[in-house]
């Protein structure tokens, strides 16, 4: 299935999850629970395969999810996971949670920013970058998602929605190469 179709399927579930977290007055708790669930599932390839396998019975999936998360996350999150199993959407959990976080950030007026760097940013650099992004976007909160890509050689790339700011050394070299080729 194409990514856009998968996101269209994930949207109503993410909307419902956000509504549930707001009704339970537990958006922060739900967000931390979902982060923990994503971390557990992403660390275990076997669990990921198990949950996405259509041949595994739903009751078995529910039992495993209950054993893993029942005492660690909110009841409404566990019930939500059971609904996903019943509707055969548990394999889309990662997409649903991603979309949920996008909705949370929009609700909190948080600007989701992807930063790709050649090396780790220091805490001071992150704070300075967050402050610059706040000024640029007139946003209240900025959430940085940092990724290391050593092919950048130096500098960084910032993605805010559809905007891309390429301040990397490899980007500058590509610009110079393009300029030399066209002249």
Curated annotation (Swiss-Prot):
Alphabetical list of NCBIfam families matching this protein: ATP_synt_delta
Family per record: Belongs to the ATPase delta chain family.
Keywords annotated in UniProt: ATP synthesis, CF(1), Chloroplast, Hydrogen ion transport, Ion transport, Membrane, Plastid, Thylakoid, Transport
Gene Ontology molecular-function annotations: proton-transporting ATP synthase activity, rotational mechanism
Record carries keyword Chloroplast: yes
Cellular-component GO terms for this entry: chloroplast thylakoid membrane; proton-transporting ATP synthase complex
Record text on subunit structure and interactions: F-type ATPases have 2 components, F(1) - the catalytic core - and F(0) - the membrane proton channel. F(1) has five subunits: alpha(3), beta(3), gamma(1), delta(1), epsilon(1). CF(0) has four main subunits: a(1), b(1), b'(1) and c(10-14). The alpha and beta chains form an alternating ring which encloses part of the gamma chain. F(1) is attached to F(0) by a central stalk formed by the gamma and epsilon chains, while a peripheral stalk is formed by the delta, b and b' chains.
Location of this chain's protein in the cell: Plastid, Chloroplast thylakoid membrane
Residue spans crossing the bilayer: none
PROSITE patterns attached to this UniProt entry: ATPASE_DELTA
Name of the featured protein: ATP synthase subunit delta, chloroplastic
HAMAP family: ATP_synth_delta_bact
InterPro entries: ATP_synth_OSCP/delta_N_sf, ATPase_OSCP/d_CS, ATPase_OSCP/dsu
SUPFAM superfamilies: N-terminal domain of the delta subunit of the F1F0-ATP synthase
Gene3D superfamilies in the record: N-terminal domain of the delta subunit of the F1F0-ATP synthase
Lineage top rank: taxon: Eukaryota
Task performed by this protein: F(1)F(0) ATP synthase produces ATP from ADP in the presence of a proton or sodium gradient. F-type ATPases consist of two structural domains, F(1) containing the extramembraneous catalytic core and F(0) containing the membrane proton channel, linked together by a central stalk and a peripheral stalk. During catalysis, ATP synthesis in the catalytic domain of F(1) is coupled via a rotary mechanism of the central stalk subunits to proton translocation. This protein is part of the stalk that links CF(0) to CF(1). It either transmits conformational changes from CF(0) to CF(1) or is implicated in proton conduction.
Entry membrane topology: Peripheral membrane protein
Main subcellular location of this protein, as a coarse class: plastid
